[in-house]
Structure formats: C-alpha cells, structure tokens
C-alpha cells in the first residue's frame, strides 16, 4: 500500500461518521507498510476530514508506532472522543457486553484504561479489539480500517446503551460464557468467511440483476444512515415464491458486488457454489414462508433500537401511519445469533407486527417493498432515539 492509497482509504471510510447520533472527534490511523503509518491529526472532527489533515510517520514514532511495532495483526487504529464514551469512561472501570456484536468484535469484556500510553493500551488490547481511555474516549483496532471503525462505533453504541439504560430499567448483560463463545466464533469463523476476492457470476435474468443491485444500494443507504456498523445486519428480497436473494456473510456493504448476492431456496435452504449467505438466512427464509405479503427484509444494528435490545425492552408505536404499517415493537427472547432457536424466538415476537426487537442484538423489519421497509426502519429508529432522548446533538450543532 502506498501513501495515496492509504489516505484515500481513510477519507473514504471517514464517511462512517455521519453524526446521526453523535459528533466524533479523534484520529484515524493506518499502517502503510513495515516502515511507516499515516494518521490524521489529533482531535479533528472525523466527518470533516480532508486530504490536508493527514501526515506520514515512521513506524517507531510515538505510542501509535509502538502499538504497530508490537502487534503485526493490527493494521488500523481509530481513536474517537464522544460525549457518551467520555462519560462512561469516567464512571466505570470495565464494560460488560449487553450487545452480542460487542462481545463478538471487541471481546467478552472491555477495559477502561487509566491512560493512553502504549504499554497500558497493549495490555488492554490483549485478545481484544478495543477499549476505553478514562476521560478521553475510545480506541479500536483491526486488521482493516473498516473493522476498526466498526469496532469504535459498536463501543460508542454500547456506551450510549449504558448511559440511557436507566430509562429502560437497566441492561440485561450476556453471561460471561456466552460472551466468550461469541468472541471465539467471530475470531474463528465469522471474520474469515467470504475471503475469496471474486466469485463467478450466476446467470440471471434482467429482473434478478435489478433486484441484486437494489440490495446493494440498500446496504449502502443503511450504512450512510448509520443503521448498521461495518458488515453487521443483512438484507434480502423475494425473487419468486420459492427463492430469495440475500446479502453475503461478513462483507462490507461498500465492497459487495452484484455476483456476491446469494440466491437461496427458502424451503430447503440450498444455495450451491456461491458466497456464504448471511448467518440469519434461516430467519429470512422463515419469514418468506410464513408471510406471503413479505417481499423484503432488513435487519439493523442501529444505536437507539440497540439500547432497547440490550435492555430486553420494547415500545409502543401509536402514531399513524406507522401504527398500521408496523404495530408495536416487541422484544424477542435472547438466543444465540444464527441459530434455529433465535429464528423461533423472533417468529414468536414478530407475530401481529411487521418488525421486532432482537434481544441483545438489533431489530428486524419486513414489508412488501424494499425502499418502504428501509424508510420504516429509519423512522422506527428515530422513534427509539426520541424515546431515549438522544441522537439530536449533531443536528442542534448544525442549526
């Protein structure tokens, strides 16, 4: 990787901080090669970064250089300072996972470091992909900048859930064994799926080609709307009475190509020699089988709804037309992601509605049209944020 490619990657991925929920100040860092790394200057507003904000450093420079020199598995580092992260880090010494994506991508627990020295951070990052720095914010690391940014946003989301959980009678934490198993699964399986650079294109008609591209566009829109972090969440469309098209597992929404979308039979769940489908394919297929009017499904990991998910709480929707389109948001019982048991739990919770909250996880929405379903997911997320009283700060600052 050369410096221009690295700078382009950081600028491109800085659009993950769209300020729907919070304004993030901080630093994006990427290893260029064995001798250098590129970094934005400290404490800049990440959504406003420009080409002039980056500098090249020797790999041995500063605490960042010492982290890179000590850990060859770390190629990207993200520092973010937000109100929720600072507040949580001042009041706590450790974070327990109440969201399973935190357990998976970051670790079974998260340390609050007393300082930001390389020695302290390296200790906290042992077998972890992130931590808090007391009174300063978040550091997240990864093999790629996409993974590090996703980790930082998941830590921020979890800090928000901790702070606002008092309005929801507290959080329901994952037990330590479950959290450890989820992290082990991510390291051993999820993070390694669909690593093949390209797959062969499956012959399809014009309608299927169009639907595949609609899924891709929807994924990018979900990311821009901050309804998901990184590769989390999933999307599907009904192709015909017996077949669905679904997003692949573990792939960033901005890297998915037309041929990466997986065609699957909703009855026998066969998909042949394609990408591995989203781990929630059983749930999507079950919804298509049960509800003939279901033509589109979206699964999100958005901040507001995630706070309710972490508390095993639902909420009422009484405002028209949303009350008719969705119904109340009930919360399912917690079950391990990607299992038949999770599918059964969600199918029970979604009965009589077109959406539900998934305990310790996120939310699922279905409808007749993909664009309408995405609009509903955005509207319900805004409703969750309003009920909690957060997510308006960035808009107020711009006003």
Locate predicted features.
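Glycine-rich flexible loops
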Residues: 1-399
